[in-house]
Amino acid sequence: MSKRDFYEVLGVPKNASDDELKKAYRKLAMKYHPDRNQGDAAKPAEEKFKEAKEAYEILSDAQKRAAYDQYGHAGVDPNMRGGMGGAEGFGGFAEAFGDIFGDMFGGARGRGGRQVYRGNDLSYAMDVTLEEAAKGKEAQIRIPSWESCETCHGSGAKPGTSAKTCGTCQGSGTVQMRQGFFSVQQTCPHCRGTGKIIPEPCTACHGQGRVKKQKTLEVKIPAGIDDGMRIRSTGNGEPGTNGGPPGDLYIEIRIRKHDIFERDGDDLHCQVPVSFITAALGGEIEVPTLQGKAAIDIPEGTQAGKQFRLRGKGIKGVRASYPGDLYCHIIVETPVKLTEHQRKLLKELDESLKKGGAKHSPSTESWTDRLKSFFS
């Protein structure tokens, strides 16, 4: 099957400028890229993608474009003539999409064709108390950090020597690897994308140009921060490669288990034990809050599980306008290790209460009635 005209493939006139060619190619490549076309549309899209790639690689090269304009496909197809050299893999693709796909996959082109990479992000786990999380705090942390080697001033080469241009990639930092129909541009395995080879590495940094040290950072923990939240420290991650920007440091907050309170969002919960005498007769008890002590009036006849709400005694979250509440859950404590005299008094009380029936123990009486109905 005869090939379509390359200008027709890209949808541009024969006098199209380089910018018009690039714009047309980018539009087609984005439309027919394999990642965007799945299922039944995958095969036709792949053919369109290859066709557009080949057309752009020929027309974006001044020498190949001139040969194509004069001789047509025969001027650029090595299978149709003695070999003027065909398309060179993804060269045109990388040129047209370097700024898009480079960012997507973490790499970009620096000057001289060297791969520029953003540094990796780092993570740090910080333990704080509930009180510190509620009020906020400033803290110092020490993290491992890569710094420029003082011996070689970051060059990686032994003092008095210098790095040489990589002979494998000719300083570009990348090599062409053919995979079936495609030629894929990959990081040079010899120089690892730096474009340079160091014949005599610096003994202090072993040719890396940087050494690992401990760095102290001031961290501000905002009031109301919750467990699992992260604080980003911009630019304090690992340094980039070949002049790339550094990554970020993410500090993950872990709130230690508290002896009294449990946090639920901006609210706090605590279990408050009271004696069965206080629960029966009522009274005032003292409970702790993050702001200090508070009093609760226990009404007469309070049952286990009763919940008392203290408004505004919780935590004001990072994005909240008002603080949460404190919920006190009552636990009626049963006395233990009774003396004989105490046992006698309780038995007398029990007999007296039984005579009152539902008057004194409505829940027990109701439960007894339901049991009788169930077994009848």
Swiss-Prot record:
Zinc-finger ranges (CR-type): 136-214
Residue ranges occupied by any J domain in the UniProt entry: 5-72
Record SMART domains: DnaJ (SM00271)
UniProt GO molecular function: ATP binding; heat shock protein binding; unfolded protein binding; zinc ion binding
GO BP: chaperone cofactor-dependent protein refolding; DNA replication; protein refolding; response to heat
Record-linked SUPFAM superfamilies: Chaperone J-domain (SSF46565), DnaJ/Hsp40 cysteine-rich domain (SSF57938), HSP40/DnaJ peptide-binding domain (SSF49493)
Gene Ontology, cellular component aspect: cytoplasm
Record's keyword terms, sorted: Chaperone, Cytoplasm, DNA replication, Metal-binding, Repeat, Stress response, Zinc, Zinc-finger
Record's compositionally biased regions (Gly residues): 237-246
Cell compartment(s), UniProt: Cytoplasm
Cofactor dependence: Zn(2+)
Feature: compositional bias, Basic and acidic residues: 367-376
This protein's record includes keyword Nucleotidyltransferase: no
Chief location category: cytoplasm
Gene3D superfamilies linked to this entry: DnaJ domain, Heat shock protein DnaJ, cysteine-rich domain, Urease metallochaperone UreE, N-terminal domain
Sequence segments annotated as region (Disordered): 227-246, 354-376
CXXCXGXG motif repeats: 149-156, 166-173, 188-195, 202-209
Binding residues for Zn(2+) 2: C166, C169, C188, C191
Cofactor note: Binds 2 Zn(2+) ions per monomer.
InterPro entries per the UniProt record, alphabetical: DnaJ (IPR012724), DnaJ_C (IPR002939), DnaJ_domain (IPR001623), DnaJ_domain_CS (IPR018253), HSP40/DnaJ_pept-bd (IPR008971), HSP_DnaJ_Cys-rich_dom (IPR001305), HSP_DnaJ_Cys-rich_dom_sf (IPR036410), J_dom_sf (IPR036869)
The keyword Cytoplasm belongs to this UniProt entry's keyword annotation: yes
Family affiliation: Belongs to the DnaJ family.
Domain statement: The J domain is necessary and sufficient to stimulate DnaK ATPase activity. Zinc center 1 plays an important role in the autonomous, DnaK-independent chaperone activity of DnaJ. Zinc center 2 is essential for interaction with DnaK and for DnaJ activity.
Quaternary state and interactors: Homodimer.
Protein name stated in the entry: Chaperone protein DnaJ
Lineage, top ranks: Bacteria, Pseudomonadati, Pseudomonadota, Betaproteobacteria, Burkholderiales
